[in-house]
Regions:
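Outer membrane beta-barrel
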Residues: 71-137, 266-273, 279-283
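Glycine-centered structural positions embedded in regular secondary structure
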Residues: 24-30, 135, 157-159, 171, ...
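Exposed, low-structure sequence patches enriched in small/polar residues
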Residues: 46-54, 81, 162-164, 168-176, ...
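Hydrophobic, small-residue-rich alpha-helical packing segments that form membrane-like cores
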Residues: 139, 143-197
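Bacterial N-terminal signal peptides
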Residues: 2-10
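Transmembrane beta-strand segments of Gram-negative outer membrane beta-barrel proteins
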Residues: 15-41, 47-49, 59-68, 90-99, ...
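Outer-membrane beta-barrel translocator/receptor signature
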Residues: 46-53, 61-66, 78-84, 93-94, ...
Length: 541
């Protein structure tokens, strides 16, 4: 924050004010909903009453832009207090500041859109880039304060990005986060949780060459992850010649690993083709990402191009993935992933899309010498989806037919007495009719699903009917739908009826009202009736 405050006078001195511009402009939006809920027959899945409030406020002062946002809601049955977040990111020319609950992204392997409560700055003058942040990534919570009954430590983090270039870019990133060991009482630390820390240094680059037909993308990182800050520290003689190890507080629960993704693409007119190599070593982790799969290596080939004067679009990719890079797992897994997509649109009335995907997984036992190289899993999953659309009409009526079909087959080729595979078939047909003068609309639909496996089958079919009407010079939209589905299992049959009504009324250019109500009734085993209703209002200023 000292850096930000020191920067403000410089920015103010460099500011050029347009005397004809409004010195202050304010705009934004405010909305809220109130919902009711009732369940009969089984346990309720949410509270009887709920609410949500959200708002945005944009203030412009002599070119400075200050956007504010806030959200408050109450949902679920185990929250003891409302959920509230607030953040602001004022911006002026190439300067952007952050305060409150914010998200920043440096790279995939350092800081990747994790939410923090704190402050930050982004500077982007011409081809130069600088970003920095500091804040709390998670607050301390005792086990009895958390809806999942699991305690968590207070976690603080900071990071920076330094980059150059526009067409060809080079970014150096750094991020560190650590849990506060003293943020939980001793009783909660007895759970199977440990204070963690991570330090990651990354390099990201994008370079175009060969008359911009070749594009090289690289995202590389090396990081140290400690899964228990309470573990014994390393002896000084171990890192005597590597002082950085001591500065970062490495201990016997620390691990040093790398990660990266490098891709090369060839682009000419509308044809693209490329290859990407990706590897995340075992033990690599950054606390700046919500989720990152480690111990994986993958190579992917991809291509896309049009034919028949752009009426036919073809694309596809094929990849090979494996884990157990250090041969320390009990079993190793390899996957082959392939997909192809064909999109054909001969006219504005007709379109056909075909997608095929093939996923195979192969797992072998590695460490047990008695069963070395024996196959544990050998499965292939085929999936085909075909979607067609046909539209026609005149000045009075518009018709639309859509049909989506899907087929999925899982084949189990593992060593064993039986095939554990399964099959799934989906069919969805929908017809829409619109009367342009009266603003009426009609929707008819039918669906069919058939699932079969070794020990069970499930056949489901149903129909949908709905109507829409536009009133008040298209300011009021009314919609009513009813859906019926029947599910047939070997030992029982269930019927589900679902009715939904909604109204959206645009009172003016700045005000809108929303109302919705729905009812779900299940007949058969575990019969129940569920009713929901919501009213909402939104305004712009």
């Amino acid at each position: 924050w000292a850096f930000v405050l020191a920067l403000l006078p410089v920015l103010s001195a460099a500011q050029v004010v347009d005397p004809n511009a409004d010195p202050v402009r304010i705009s934004g939006a405010l909305g809220g909903t109130l919902s009711g809920y009732q369940m009969n027959g089984i346990n309720a899945r949410q509270q009887p009453l709920g609410y949500s409030l959200s708002g945005t406020l944009n203030i412009s002062v002599y070119g400075w832009t200050l956007p504010f946002s806030v959200a408050i809601s109450r949902q679920g049955s185990t929250f003891s207090q409302p959920f509230t977040r607030f953040g602001v990111s004022p911006e002026y020319k190439w300067v952007k500041l952050h305060a409150g609950h914010r998200n920043l992204r440096f790279s995939e392997f350092t800081l990747n859109n994790v939410t923090f409560l704190g402050g930050g700055v982004e500077l982007r003058p011409k081809a130069f880039r600088f970003s920095a942040m500091y804040g709390m990534l998670q607050q301390a919570q005792r086990a009895d304060e958390n809806r999942y009954g699991v305690a968590q430590y207070k976690r603080m983090g900071y990071g920076a990005l330094l980059g150059l270039g526009r067409k060809n870019t080079f970014d150096l990133t750094f991020f560190r986060a650590a849990d506060d060991v003293s943020s939980l009482p001793l009783l909660d630390t007895l759970q199977r949780i440990t204070p963690q820390a991570s330090t990651t240094l990354g390099l990201r680059s994008r370079v175009q060459f060969a008359k911009d037909r070749l594009v090289l993308d690289a995202d590389l990182a090396v990081g140290a992850y400690t899964h228990d800050l309470n573990a014994p520290r390393l002896d000084e003689d171990i890192y005597a010649d590597r002082p950085i190890v001591g500065e970062l507080g490495f201990n016997y629960a620390s691990n040093l690993a790398g990660a990266g993704a490098v891709g090369l693409d060839y682009v000419k007119d509308k044809f693209t083709s490329g290859v990407q190599y990706r590897m995340v070593q075992p033990g690599f982790r950054t606390l700046g990402a919500n989720y990152l799969l480690s111990d994986v290596e993958q190579i992917t080939l991809r291509t896309a191009f049009p034919l028949a004067k752009d009426k036919l679009q073809l694309s596809g990719q094929f990849g090979v993935q494996r884990n157990n890079l250090s041969d320390r797992r009990f079993a190793g897994t390899a996957r082959n992933i392939g997909s192809a997509n064909v999109a054909y649109r001969p006219s504005t009335r007709v379109s056909v899309n075909l997608n095929y995907a093939n996923f195979s997984i192969y797992q072998t036992l590695l460490l047990d010498t008695l069963f070395a190289d024996s196959v544990l899993i050998d499965q292939v999953n085929h999936q085909v989806i075909v979607a067609t659309l046909y539209q026609y009409g005149d000045a009075k009526r518009q018709h639309s037919w859509s049909l989506m079909t899907g087929y999925q087959q899982l084949s189990d080729r593992s060593d064993g007495p039986t095939d554990l595979g399964n099959r799934l078939i989906n069919l969805n047909l929908q017809y829409q009719l619109r009367w342009l003068a009266s603003r009426w609309g009609l929707v008819l639909g039918a669906n069919y699903n058939d699932y079969s496996a070794l020990l069970t089958t499930n056949e489901r079919y149903g129909a949908t009917v709905g109507a829409t009407r536009m009133l008040k010079k298209d300011k009021l939209l009314l919609r009513l739908t009813h859906t019926w589905n029947r599910s047939q299992l070997p030992d029982r049959m269930d019927d589900i009826h679902s009715t939904h009504f909604s109204m959206n009324y645009r009172l003016s250019d700045r005000h809108a009202l929303m109302l919705s109500a729905g009812n779900i009734r299940r007949e058969g085993l575990q019969a129940f009736t569920e009713t929901r209703g919501t009213v909402g209002y939104r305004m712009r200023f």
